[in-house]
Amino acid sequence: MDHTDDRKMYGTTILSIRRGNSVIVAGDGQVTLGSTIMKTSARKIKRLASNTVITGFAGATADAFTLFERLEGKLEKHPGQLMRACVELAKDWRQDKYLRRLEAMMIVADKSVSLVISGGGDVLEPENGIAAIGSGGNLALAAARALCAAQDEFAPAMPLEYIVAKSMAIAAEICIYTNNNIVMEKIEG
C-alpha cells in the first residue's frame, strides 16, 4: 500500500490465529493520515451475526464499514454459512462498479473457518490457521508462525492469547503504521 497520499488514511495490522477449537482475531488501534497519526485507539475488530463471527479490516475506514454492512446482510441471508456469505460478498465486491473502488481487506472468522477477503474478489482460507493483513501484516504473520511452531515443539501450554499479543507487539515494534493498542476477540468452538 502506498502511504504517500496525505489525503488517505492508512496503517493497521490485523492478525487471526486458529489453534485447536479456538480462534482469535486481533487488530491495533492506529490510524495514519499521510505521515500523521490521527488516532491511536481505533477499533478495527467487530463482531457480527449475533457475536458468532469476528471481522477485522485493513484499509480505508469508510470502505471497511461499507463492507461490514454488506457482509452482515449476506450473513442474514445465509445464516451459519460464513463461507457462502463471504463468497457472495466477494462476488458483489468484484462486480459492482461502486464496490470495486473500495480500498480494504478483511479477515473473517467463525467457530469453524477463517477467511481473508480481498477487493480483487479473492476468498482465501489460510493453510495453517494463521492470517494477517495490513501494513504490519507480514511482520505479525512471521512472528505468529514462529511462535506457533515453538508452541508445537517446546511449549504446548503457551496460551493462544500470548501468541497473538506477542505477534502483534513484534509488528508494532517494526511497523510505523501499527501501535500497541491491541483489541482481541475470541471464539471457542
From Swiss-Prot:
One of its GO terms (molecular function) is threonine-type endopeptidase activity. The active site is at T12. Signal peptide: none annotated. It is an enzyme of class 3 (hydrolase). GO terms for biological process: proteolysis involved in protein catabolic process. Its main location: cytoplasm. Allosterically activated by HslU binding. Its EC number is 3.4.25.2. This is ATP-dependent protease subunit HslV. It comes from Anaplasma phagocytophilum (strain HZ). The gene is hslV.
